[in-house]
Amino acid sequence: MLTLILVLLILLVLAEVWTLLLRCRRGHPGWKLLRQYRYAHRGYHDKPHIPENSMAAFRRAIEHGYGAELDVHLMKDGRLAVIHDASLKRTAGADVLVEDLTAEELKQYHLEGTQEQIPLLEEVLPLFQGKTPLIIELKAERGNHAQLAEATCAMLDWFRVNYCIESFDPRCI
């Protein structure tokens, strides 16, 4: 009985330590800045005029004082597309995967029946320099998590943007 109690206590302590390790690091210097903003999910969009994850949606978010959340996919040429879905079907009407395209090929598609093109991360980041922060969600596909994370970090090194990176694939973080 004593052994069982000791095992349960050890498991309880380990669970508590694990919980503490997973807590957000609120002491990080950037945390206070990020918490000062509200965020426009996929930019400040409205159908049918301003599509999600478009340059117009990001400009509108900044104009209204919002930070923005955006999604990033790695393309076959190593460039980073800003789009939520792995496929262009819902947002651009084409049954093609983002990761199977190059940046040049991506430019032929338009978002949701508008003239807005699917932006590259390198086009979006300058909008946010010295302005509102970004929440960047990494969307890994087919095991490209390491390349996606490396390409995103390399791109962020070129711009003075306040940001937070998130992903539902823990291998990206």
Regions found by a protein language model. Name each.
Residues 2-173:
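Phosphate-group recognition and catalysis centered on beta-loop-alpha active-site segments
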